[in-house]
Structure formats: C-alpha cells, structure tokens
Amino acid sequence: MALLSIVSLQVPKSCGLKSLISSSNVQKALCISTAVPTLRMRRRQKALVINMKLTTVSHRDDNGGGVLQRRIADHHPNLWEDDFIQSLSSPYGGSSYSERAVTVVEEVKEMFNSIPNNRELFGSQNDLLTRLWMVDSIERLGIDRHFQNEIRVALDYVYSYWKEKEGIGCGRDSTFPDLNSTALALRTLRLHGYNVSSDVLEYFKDQKGHFACPAILTEGQITRSVLNLYRASLVAFPGEKVMEEAEIFSASYLKEVLQKIPVSSFSREIEYVLEYGWHTNLPRLEARNYIDVYGQDSYESSNEMPYVNTQKLLKLAKLEFNIFHSLQQKELQYISRWWKDSCSSHLTFTRHRHVEYYTMASCISMEPKHSAFRLGFVKTCHLLTVLDDMYDTFGTLDELQLFTTAFKRWDLSETKCLPEYMKAVYMDLYQCLNELAQEAEKTQGRDTLNYIRNAYESHFDSFMHEAKWISSGYLPTFEEYLKNGKVSSGSRTATLQPILTLDVPLPNYILQEIDYPSRFNDLASSLLRLRGDTRCYKADRARGEEASAISCYMKDHPGSTEEDALNHINVMISDAIRELNWELLRPDSKSPISSKKHAFDITRAFHHLYKYRDGYTVASSETKNLVMKTVLEPVAL
C-alpha cells in the first residue's frame, strides 16, 4: 500500500491498539483464543438429557404369529400441540400493514435513486461504499425481494470501478483503495455472480505479509473493516489461500475485540456473525437479529452515509417481518392439521418434528409466493424422518424388504402384504408424492413423479444397505460407508421435490447441475452425512447403529482415536464447503444462482440444526428458541 501511512493489523492487547495479527503467528493466536470462550458469546443451553440407549419392545406380528423384538429409540415427543398451534393469531395480516409496507418500499427505492452517480460532481468520495452498504443492509434485514432491480443497478455501478489488483475505495474518486469497501464488495459481488478474485486482498498486506490498514482510521472503523473481511472470507473458493488466511486472522481478531469492548449493538452483531457465519446462517434468523442492532452503530449512523435513512429501512424490515409472521402462522396451522390427520401421526417409534421443519423452511424462503415450497419441504422431511426411524430401528429386515419392494411397484394393492404400521407410512408417502408432483407440474409444466420416485428408490436401497449392516454387525470401510451414506442422508430427496414447486423453471440442463449425479448434489449430500455423523454418532451407537463416518475411519486407520477421525472429517467438511460455494457461485455456470439458491439454502438449514448437536432429535433447546424467535414471536413495531 504505497504512499499511505499504514499500521500492521495484529490481535489487540488492549482497547487502545490499532493493529491485528501477523500471518506467521495467526495459527498460534487462533489456538489460544479459541481455547477460551469469549466473554459475551451467548451461552449454549444445557443439552436435554435423553436416554438414547436402545429399548427393545415385544410386538406380536399382524398375522397372529410369534412375538417380534423391535428396537425403539427414546425420542422426546412433539413439543407443539395442535390445540396450541390452532390458537395462534396475528393482526399483521390486515391490509393496513401491507399498504404501509408498499408505501415504505417506494420510499426506499427513492433512497436508492438519491445516491450520487458518476454524472454528478458531488458525492464521489462515498458513492461506492454507500451502494454496497445499502445492498448489504437490505439483504441482512430480509427485505431484498422488493429491490432486485435496484440491487443489480447498484452492483453494476460498483463493479464498473472494481480493480482486480486493488479493489475499490469508498468512492469513485477515492485516492486509495479501502479494506472495508473492498471486503464488502468482494463478498457482495461474488454472492451475486460477478467475477471477482480474492487476490485483491493481497493488496492489503504490508511487506511482511501482515494485513494492514491506514493509521488514520478509528478503532471502530478498523473493527468494521475486519468484520467485513471475515464475512468475505467465508465465501471462499477452493485453493484461495488468502481467504483462508483472512478467515483465521479476522476470526481471532474479532474474538479478542469482543473481550475488550463494552456490550453494544455492534458487539452483538459481531457475536452473531462469528456464531453463524455463512454456512449455518438462516436469512430469517439473521433478519430477526439484525433488526435488533441495525442503525445503532455510531460509525454507520454518522454523516458518512447522508443518503441513507436507516430508520426507514428498519421500519420496512419490521413491517415485512410481522406480515410474513402472520402468513407463517396460517401455514403452520395447516401443517399441524395435516400432521394430525396423517396416517403416521400416531406412530410412537418416530420423531414428530413438523413444526421444526416448517421453521427451517420459512427461515430460508421468506417470499409469500413460495408457500408450496415451504409446505412441501415440511411434508417431505416429516415422512423422511418416519422412514429413517423405521429403517434404522423399528422395522425388521424382512418387513423392510417388503416395504422397499412395494414402493418400487407403486401400487396401493401392494400394501396388503405390509404390517399395519407400514401401511400407514406407505399411504402417507403415496399421497404426499402424488400431491407434490401435481404442485410441481403447475410450475415446471411437466410430470416429475417418475423422476422423484427414482430418487426415493435409490434412497430406500441405501436404507436397506444400512439395515443389513445393523442386522449383521458389519462395519464397512470409510469409502463404502460414505458412498452409501451420501444417499441415505436424504439430502437429495429432501431437496428435489420441494424445489420443483418453486416458480423458478428447472429444465433438465439446470437439474443436471443440482441433482444427482452432479457435483453440487454430491457435495451437499456429503456435507449432510459428515456433519450429521459428527453430531449423532454416539447416540446412534447407543441405539445399535455402529457404522458412522467416525467408526469407519477408525477401522481403516488402526490406532487412530475418535479425535483423529473428527479432525479428518472436519477438514473434509471445510473443503467441501468451499467447493459447494464454487458450485453455487461459479461465474461460468450455465444456470443462474437463483435456480440453485434454494437447494443451497436447504443445505445451510441442515447445517444450522447440526451446529452444536442433532437439533432435530433433541429439539427442546436451541431449536425451540429458533421456533419462538422466527415463527411464533413478532417484533415490536
């Protein structure tokens, strides 16, 4: 950074320092800082203690024959009674609120138009950062669906000033590039499909390879720059070493900052970003948290953003949050009735998590018109959970083979050979797949039922492999386990039919980039299997399911420990995340990002629930709080 007085950025030893961390010491510093929790990181609630050991129950078979020994896991029951769900009400579905929102949307569009452009002499010192900050704020507040055209125009403007080796400054006439503006631009432009290289971050290192910034910046401005550097680093592609360095460095720096600065809206924003990052972040949860802190940071509220009315953006965000909250309650009431009336609702061997699945769906898809996607996702995931518990624990090997064969024949008359509990599961599955295929035909213009059935057949075959492993006590190799586990994870079946109900056309050439055997599908399935195993392997083992990525790795590597296996798998997960970023955002893709975004967000939703434990099986702590915060509770207007 020639011709500019700079300071190397090192982890602050006290509040007064303006520097961060050297590349040579960053690994050591990170190990130190991550060993001790930061002072105000939100405490994890104590896990609900559940007896996950196998319970064996005796059942007489339906033909009056001998007594069958069945395996049942001790899952906690549904936490949300239908009577409670049906009692929910919200005033925010009224026309007065939607009319107010329409008015504010137009006012925000005018705000976009008021930002100076290159045809005006004034405003040239901050026009780039203002546009980026507007786009970033709107997206984090969950109101970006109203401003897609304005966002594209703003980012085209920013990109026109992007320099591959230097990035950008705050404005088009800025003398020097700026780390905050460049990091925010790198992240935002990349997420919108622009071809930007992370090599630009090398410009912001000194001669010793340390990240650096101008000495004239305040501590708050430096911290904001590092926060956006961290956010940018999370959308890394494979092989981007500078992004890895930026992530390690910025995470360490921000954790140290949190131990020094007082509690504020800015500190809470940092905490949220560090906790959820990008791959476990849910858009609606982010909007809920950002509403609480938005516009209170003195740096962002200063005169450096004279064309931005933060209170107007906040007003719209609150209105939109509550209007959608009203729709959520109606959809949730429908789902609760559907579950209560379903054939499988009375089954006691399985987890009933329809409310939790709805929460996931509505946290990643907030457009009112995507109701079919949300409802289809819930129904699909509920049935996949029932099937998972049936194949893993309750069903006998002979029964499971009968069910698999009956499904492949796709004929209701085949249910006569099934035990009663399987008839209930088969009926629900048959009705749901036909119903969702009809929904998909409305948007895709073609019958997708056979396509979906093929995906389920592969899924059930993988279930059968695992059931046979459990029955025989066989422990496969890691490669054999993962090949089958990608399919049995359910990532493909949980994703495929819901995304076909969206209003986004998915012709075959796009499906080939999302569905099996695409690299996108392979990565998403691997991530769900590996992350799920790291959170569930002990409980699964207690239920008699010995095969997991951890146990299979240890078998392949005699003398290795569980810690060795977990370290290896976590590296695989990190690498796969960067690859999945590339598959979503690659500039040379034939299909638009929008066509793959919901599939990508489903992966993020699963990762969120597996962040600390199996948040589906044990849904009484973090998951329950998520339901309350994003579905049941409105924000104060």
From Swiss-Prot:
Pathway annotation from the record: Terpene metabolism; oleoresin biosynthesis
Cofactor, free-text remark: Binds 3 Mg(2+) or Mn(2+) ions per subunit.
Protein name: Limonene/alpha-pinene synthase, chloroplastic
Task of the protein: Involved in defensive oleoresin formation in conifers in response to insect attack or other injury. Involved in monoterpene (C10) olefins biosynthesis.
Keyword hit for Chloroplast: yes
Main location: plastid
Residue interval of the organelle targeting sequence: 1-56
Source organism (scientific name): Abies grandis
